[in-house]
Structures are given as C-alpha cells and as structure tokens.
Amino acid sequence: MQIWVDADACPNVIKEVLFRAADRTQMQVTLVANQTIKVPPSRFISTLRVAAGFDVADNEIVRSVESGDLVITADIPLASEVIEKGGIALNPRGERYTPDTIRERLNMRDFMDTMRASGIQTGGPSTLNQRDRQQFANELDKWLQQVRKS
C-alpha cells in the first residue's frame, strides 16, 4: 500500500506532514503533478510529473491506485473514482471521503455553480488553519495504524 498525492493543489504544510510520515513509517508517498514539485531527499518519497492538461494528474492517480491505497485530494470526482477502485480518499483538511459525503459535496458544488452562474458571489473555502492541519495528521495516523495492523 502507498499514498498518492494530487500535488498540484495540495497545501505545502500538508506535504510536509506527508514527508515526515513517509520517513517515519517507511511508507511510499508519490506526488503526482503537472509541474515540478520540490521534495526532500528520501527513498520513500517520489514525484510523478504528468503532462499539463485537464484531469491528466487525476487520471494518472486513478490508473495507478490500488485497493487500500490512500489518496490525498480535494477533488471530489477524483475521490469518487478512488473509492470506486477500493482506495481511501482524504482531503487536506482531514475529512475522509465516503460515498455519502461525496454525493453531498457534489450536490453542494453544483448548487454553488448555479449560484455563481446567476451572478451571486459565493467566495471560496476558508484558509487552511492549524486545526485543519491537526485533523489531517490525525486521520493520516489512523490510516497508517490500520495499514500496520493488516
């Protein structure tokens, strides 16, 4: 099992948590992006650069992920495909996606798109804070412990 990261949009503070976890647990972490991603030297951390384009990184992650792998992403359609393949999807705020939360998020996204299309300014997500970072680290640790037990 390994960890895949939708790295183009993953906050640096979350990448740092993942880098430390990779070395601490000797778990392979692969960052997939359409640009060069700077990573610390480690035999447990790798990058996979894909061509620029819509969903190219997402498609590579879906192609590569195996049952039980963890994928870090804020992309709801990607999370849905990961779960369909038997993977685990976790967003950078520490929310573990389920089929129910994905359905809820897709409905909300569609609603917000409709609001924006009608001229209403909706704003974006709040800035990632220390509580979000801690929630992410806690959920990552839960997954790592489950992997060690299996």
Curated annotation (Swiss-Prot):
Which InterPro entries does this entry report, sorted A to Z? UPF0178
Report the sequence similarity comment from the record: Belongs to the UPF0178 family.
Q: Which NCBIfam families match?
A: PRK00124.1
This protein is called UPF0178 protein ECA0873
Annotated organism of origin: Pectobacterium atrosepticum (strain SCRI 1043 / ATCC BAA-672) (Erwinia carotovora subsp. atroseptica)
